[in-house]
């Protein structure tokens, strides 16, 4: 049996399947456990619908069960809940539901209806400020109906260990189920909720679920590339490059020397604790984003590389050393998605890869960061030059998929270190937040995750999902997804900038904990980035208008 075979799901008892967590998955599971839910996701899909709220609430449990039947991944966990056994953070687990009572219990714990007037944004903020319980649970979903202000929404609250972009597909699947004739017929014909569930319930079987459960990126990589010694060596070379870049002196956003006991900026309190997990947001409209694309094409950059250039330059201007000190470079910490190397079906079909993050790296020398006599004030031409440099460094680092192969060994090392450090600090009685601060550098280097284009379908009817509304009768039920709001947990001393595009508009975010950072400083940096992008878009728009007059 090969190593890759040992990484696959296997039945260990009539009621339990498991597989090892590999690479980034394992690091995320240890990080989530020892760092109070770090990296957990909160993704809200806002919608409008002709379906009454009461009807949606009646259908919601059945819709969720229907989706679990097709996507058993919704029932995975990554921490053993067997109190008599040793702590196991090394495996993904899945147990079949065999009875109606078990199904109802899972639905009660997994699908939550919020109909007390709470808004989607309020719910996103609350979920971002508490970890998912019980520890190891991978998925929970909230249906927000009848908020006092704003639109209703479907909120996926998920662990990042076995999830990522897949959360959008899971939300889309629930939308489809809410409008499906099978679910609407079951609730109409069975007014009693338990009877309605019984009408669609089918006991789960391990042998049917195993081929559908998510595989690791490392397994899919090994299947596709069949790496030998040269490929493995190439992967470790990339890891060495990343470690070397991380050791270089870098600009960054400074954390507090000691975490703030009472952060100056929070979202209020939750259960008596400040909601310090902030997910700041700015948006560039579709027209300006289109202008940005034109400008990037003209100057040989890309929108993500230009955004990154603006982030790097803004951090340098807001947080850089004084002119009398040595100029630092910039360690580029970013994530990439394995879809650049793998076919689309890897992430969509049976046994999907749900956690497909690859850790990218690059380093800007002081001369590249502040070229020539420009200093920190690069101007538009300087920003595009920096964007081209960043894009080349990213392309050079991501010129091979074989870093994926090296992540298995690296994941083992990093997860062991996380556990050892956490145990030492626990024995020393170190405060949990102080421990997270001590484990982090004094400054957070420029960090960006580019999440691409949101591809969730816009309209849902009894006939399915599409990007254009087609009603057989004007009175037919329909639901329209029109906006997305994301949050999540960044519990360590880091600031992660993120970007995504939906219906042409570009959203930029900054995720961090205000116990560790000056929230006003981060807000100023984000606003400055948006301002620089706006200037580039305006310049491109003016150029286009001038050309049109010729």
Swiss-Prot record:
InterPro entries assigned to the protein according to its UniProt record, in alphabetical order: CAT-like_dom_sf
EC number from the UniProt entry: 2.-.-.-
Biotechnology: MELs not only have high potential as eco-friendly biosurfactants due to their excellent surface activity, but also have attracted considerable recent interest because of thei runique properties, including self-assembly, anti-tumor and cell differentiation induction activities, and moisturizing and hair-repairing properties.
Factors inducing expression: Expression is induced when cells are grown in cultures containing vegetable oil as the carbon source.
GO molecular function, one term: acyltransferase activity
Keywords of the record: Acyltransferase, Transferase
Pathway assignment: Secondary metabolite biosynthesis
Task of the protein: Acyl-CoA-dependent acyltransferase; part of the gene cluster that mediates the biosynthesis of mannosylerythritol lipids (MELs), surface-active substances that enhance the availability of water-insoluble substrates.
Family: Belongs to the trichothecene O-acetyltransferase family.
Protein name per Swiss-Prot or TrEMBL: Acyl-CoA-dependent acyltransferase MAC2
Organism annotation: Pseudozyma antarctica (strain T-34) (Yeast)
Gene designation per UniProt: MAC2
